[in-house]
Regions:
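Thiamine diphosphate
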Residues: 1-122, 126-130, 134-214
Length: 214
């Protein structure tokens, strides 16, 4: 497995130390390490993946450096517009290193909402013309692949995607935990809301934990 510290340090050695994105369960150890070890201004958690791409573009235009945008593959569709209108080689030709957690990979059991997205993850990258590689799960292989990605971006100014499979990164536990004094948990809040609506009312919720709890 690849230690989060190793991954972040290899990128730093290549001159990459700015991150924007939407946290993902497959990337949780990387996200935790970045949160603990980088200033807040170097790790921007965006409202959505398209917004993260916009932030990354602004960072590159201001510094000339390559940013990282991290996401779950379920957010891949959200980057199509900023990619096609800003970063693509036919427009402004701006390099962004995409780190994409591959939920629902064919042949790997996952929750139903990830199945279709898992099937089309690589196809979407091909359609957008984004070069990519599946990050090796050993540190030597990962380091070599990161260098290939960075060399490609420096030579072409194009985006490059590192696709992350399950169990690629070693465990890292977040140290800088923010303690809040909120009185209710998510589960309790959902229970209160659900118990106070009409029996024949329709509840629309997101895929994932909230729908499971309902």
């Amino acid at each position: 497995m690849v230690r989060p510290e190793f991954f972040v340090n290899i990128l730093k050695e290549q001159g990459i130390d700015f991150y924007a994105g939407v946290p993902d369960s497959l990337l949780k150890n990387i996200c935790a390490y970045i949160t603990d070890h980088l200033p807040a201004e170097q790790n921007i958690i965006a409202a959505n993946e398209g917004g993260a791409m916009g932030i990354a573009v602004g960072y590159h235009l201001a510094t000339g450096k390559v940013p990282v945008v991290y996401m779950q593959n379920s957010g891949e569709g959200n980057i199509i517009n900023p990619f096609a209108s800003l970063t693509d080689k036919d427009v402004y030709n701006i390099p962004v290193l995409l780190v994409i957690g591959w939920r629902g990979r064919p042949g790997v059991h996952d929750e139903p909402q990830h199945v279709k997205q898992g099937k089309v993850t690589i196809g979407l990258l091909n359609t957008m013309g984004i070069n990519y590689a599946i990050l090796p799960k050993d540190e030597e292989g990962a380091a070599k692949q990161i260098k290939i990605a960075v060399d490609f971006m420096k030579a072409t100014n194009e985006c490059y995607a590192l696709v992350i499979e399950k169990d690629t990164f070693d465990t890292y536990k977040l140290q800088s935990v923010e303690v809040n004094e909120l009185a209710m948990s998510r589960e309790e809040t959902i229970q209160k809301v659900a118990s106070n609506i009409e029996d024949n009312a329709c509840i629309v919720s997101t895929t994932g934990m909230i729908s499971r709890e309902l």
